[in-house]
Each structure stands twice: as C-alpha cells, then as structure tokens.
Design a protein with these regions (language model features):
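Catalytic cores and adjacent flexible loops of soluble metabolic enzymes
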Residues: 1-193
Length: 193
C-alpha cells in the first residue's frame, strides 16, 4: 500500500512545475494533484486490504508519505514500513517511522551514497533495529542494463544491512540476477494488463 492524500504530497497548483510533461504518460498534460487525487488508496480501504492479506497468510504493509500517515498506520498496527524512493531524503518521516520500532525498508532510487548514509543514520539513531535497503532504478520500465545489480553486495558492505531489489524491469531476469548477487528481498512492479 501507499498512504498519502493528494494534499499531503503536492500542491493543488496549475503552474508548469505541477503539470506532467512526459508525452508517453497516460497522465500527460494533467496536474500532479489530479493524478494523486485519482491514484491514491482511500484510507478506509487500508484495514480491509490488510485483513484480506492476513486471511491469505500474507503480511501487508505500507509506504507512508508524511508523518500523519504514520500515525494513521500505527492505529492499524502496521507490521513494517517502506520508505519510497521519493521520500528517502525525508528525514523527519524516516525518524517518525524508526521511532515505531517496526522494520523499515528504504528504497534507494535517485539517492546519492551521502543521502543514503543520512537516511540510514537517521533510521538507526531513531530506533530502527531492522533495516533493509532496496536497490532501485527510478524509471518505468527500467532496462536491465541500467538496474546496476552489481551494486547490491557493495550496498550491503557499506550499510551493514539486508539489501534487495525494487525491480521495475520487464520479466524476471533482473530479480534472478539480484538474488544471485545476494539480494534478500525482491519487490516486483508489474501490471495485469
């Protein structure tokens, strides 16, 4: 799950910086606020989704995008949290999640090593004892060549934690290569159509 509202993730503005410019996007020419308003998971759906997952023997957790989302998710007894790539430098959010004492997964898309050091340090200093990083190439779809799978062992060595892959490629080859290089978590992005 992803937990946010359009108002907590962007401004309801029509300026050039708030319009989607990617001509290949289904959302081309539309506002970011409109996209997030239409794409968000309604908060009242979270509990039924979590219950359904539990009944199927799966753990369900969420990516909060702001501190209020963490408060809401804590009311649902969220078992773990994922920090999305766009939020991996949002240190107050990382601090708030870490303070829950729950496991945290941080996606690393677009972050520099220095930014990741800050995020990992904040998580650990704020109480996170179970931390994992996901190697992530923030493009959809990502090409296997640009997925930089060989950095997985290096990340494990640098940060002393579990490392996995947030896989945006077509097919399963990148995930297999990631596991062969020591990945312990695979997050696979896919569509059913």
């Amino acid at each position: 799950l992803q937990t946010y509202t359009a108002d907590t993730i962007t401004l309801d503005a029509a300026g050039e910086d708030f319009i989607i410019k990617d001509e290949s996007s289904f959302w081309y020419g539309k506002s970011l606020h409109g996209l997030y308003r239409q794409a968000y998971t309604p908060w009242e759906w979270h509990q039924p989704i979590m219950d359904r997952a539990k009944n199927q023997g799966m753990a369900c957790f969420s990516s909060p995008f702001d501190e209020d989302s963490v408060d809401f998710l804590e009311e649902l007894n969220m078992p773990a949290y994922k920090i999305a790539s766009f939020e991996n430098n949002h240190l107050p959010l990382i601090k708030k999640v870490a303070a829950t004492g729950k496991p945290m997964i941080i996606s690393t898309g677009m972050a520099t090593i220095s930014e990741l050091y800050e995020a990992v340090s904040m998580a650990r200093e704020s109480g996170c004892e179970s931390l994992a990083l996901l190697k992530c190439t923030s493009s959809y779809p990502a090409s296997p060549e640009n997925s930089n799978i060989l950095t997985i062992p290096h990340m494990r060595e640098l940060f002393g934690c579990e490392v996995g892959l947030s896989d945006h490629t077509m097919g399963i080859g990148a995930a297999i290569a990631a596991v062969a290089n020591g990945a312990s978590i695979i997050e696979k992005h896919f569509t059913l159509s």
